[in-house]
UniProtKB/Swiss-Prot annotation:
Protein name: Programmed cell death protein 10
Membership in a protein family: Belongs to the PDCD10 family.
InterPro entries with a match to the protein in the record: PDC10_dimerisation_sf, PDCD10, PDCD10_N
Role description: Promotes cell proliferation. Modulates apoptotic pathways. Increases mitogen-activated protein kinase activity. Important for cell migration, and for normal structure and assembly of the Golgi complex. Important for KDR/VEGFR2 signaling. Required for normal cardiovascular development. Required for normal angiogenesis, vasculogenesis and hematopoiesis during embryonic development. Promotes cell proliferation. Modulates apoptotic pathways. Increases mitogen-activated protein kinase activity and STK26 activity.
Record's GO cellular component terms: cytosol; FAR/SIN/STRIPAK complex; Golgi membrane; plasma membrane
Keyword Cell membrane: yes
Gene name linked to the record: PDCD10
Molecular function via GO: protein homodimerization activity; protein kinase binding
Record's keyword terms, sorted: Angiogenesis, Apoptosis, Cell membrane, Cytoplasm, Golgi apparatus, Membrane
Highest rank taxon of the organism: Eukaryota
Coiled coil: none
Species annotation: Gallus gallus
Amino acid sequence: MRMTMEEMKNEAETTSMVSMPLYAVMYPVFNELERVNLSAAQTLRAAFIKAEKENPGLTQDIIMKILEKKSVDVNFTESLLRMAADDVEEYMIERPEPEFQDLNEKARALKQILSKIPDEINDRVRFLQTIKDIASAIKELLDTVNNVFKKYQYQNRRALEHQKKEFVKYSKSFSDTLKTYFKDGKAINVFISANRLIHQTNLILQTFKTVA
């Protein structure tokens, strides 16, 4: 049975999403290791990237096994969200033009606000303010994306438009998750949705970096 284009896109999204722990958890570890042993860190980083590409989700499985063996009781989804605000060099746009650097800044701002959700969610007043800040940050990021579209022409504009639509879709999904949260109080679903939105934010940067 052949998959439809939409199913293929969904599968690709799921595949890349499970690889999130590679850059959110392991990249900072590699960066620290580089200070001690640059060669070993680079070798280990390359090995993890290759293994993750061939077996999406492998990094997450390894981390979970280590936590299990050490009997560490941790909410992995929540922890991932807390760590996901850091810049990922592979996604940062290197072009020096102000519009592209602004895109980096707006993406960073959104990810940082989203990563604070676990600290804010139990304080209703602060969390409501955080939600407003997230909405503003989403709008600012989309405005910046549109500014880049206006100023620069791309051969692969379709890929950029698609990624923008995906980002909007996950932004709306995040909004719907928040509405449900205020009814059922299940914070874990908010964390999952926030992680997905951070992932989409990184994919916007990655797409622009690839075609720019």
